[in-house]
């Protein structure tokens, strides 16, 4: 979260070289659910790369193959994984029934944004010009929720393969239904729930921020690009404060 500290709203009076302050930070990292834990891990040199958590992610028994050329498999079973986080949907204006249709990046983004505002001292009893506060996030173009929703639409392929294998119509439909039940249902909130740009929009909407809200996809440089755009937004005088990151 960055601010020019100007607040007069007049772009012509803002020096292009005016200093930009990082006035608050909110974060969720592997083995660090908040800023204090993250900083402590840095000081202690904690390596947060771990084995894949089978209970919440995927089983190496299903996807691990030491041969890098093996199709549809992976030869790595380690990475940085965040811990399960409690999320109260009503606090963020989301109906509980819509949680499954909302990508985790949108949910985690709102948590991190709230923590950044609190860390900056803007959460309670401190006024600021919300109309000149922007949200710019770095986010990949394909979100996690796209995978199960897309897979659910493959039922014609499953049905054809089952029937070609000699199964009768009743058994085929039973198997198709069982496979479908393992994926997230499509519903009216699925499309906004899987769109990357909605991550910034949800933050702006929930916290009543009227400045620019958008996302940028620059692959591994997405978060840094978002911060770069946030700095440009501040230097141009279009915003007094920007929530930025990814």
Protein language model regions, located:
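Cys-dependent condensing catalytic cores that perform Claisen condensation/acyl-transfer
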Residues: 2, 8-246
């Amino acid at each position: 979260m960055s601010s020019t500290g100007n607040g007069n709203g007049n772009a012509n009076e803002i020096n292009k070289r005016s200093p930009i302050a990082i006035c608050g930070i909110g974060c969720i990292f592997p083995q660090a659910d908040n800023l204090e834990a993250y900083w402590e891990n840095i000081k202690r040199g904690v390596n947060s790369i771990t084995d894949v958590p089978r209970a919440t992610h995927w089983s190496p028994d299903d996807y691990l193959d030491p041969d890098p050329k093996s199709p549809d498999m992976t030869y790595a079973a380690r990475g940085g994984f965040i811990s399960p986080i409690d999320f109260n949907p009503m606090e963020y204006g989301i109906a509980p029934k819509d949680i499954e249709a909302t990508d985790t990046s949108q949910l985690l983004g709102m948590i991190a944004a709230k923590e950044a505002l609190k860390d900056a001292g803007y959460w309670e009893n401190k006024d600021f010009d919300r109309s000149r506060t922007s949200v710019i996030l770095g986010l990949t173009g394909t979100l996690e929720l796209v995978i199960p929703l897309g897979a659910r639409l493959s039922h014609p392929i499953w049905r054809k393969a089952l029937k070609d294998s000699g199964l009768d119509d009743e058994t085929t439909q039973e198997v198709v239904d069982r496979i479908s039940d393992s994926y997230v249902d499509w519903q009216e909130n699925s499309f906004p729930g899987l769109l990357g740009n909605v991550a910034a929009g949800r933050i702006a909407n929930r916290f009543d921020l009227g400045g620019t809200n958008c996302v940028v996809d620059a692959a591994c440089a997405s978060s840094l690009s978002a911060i770069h755009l946030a700095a440009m937004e501040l230097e141009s005088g279009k915003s007094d404060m920007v929530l930025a990151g990814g």
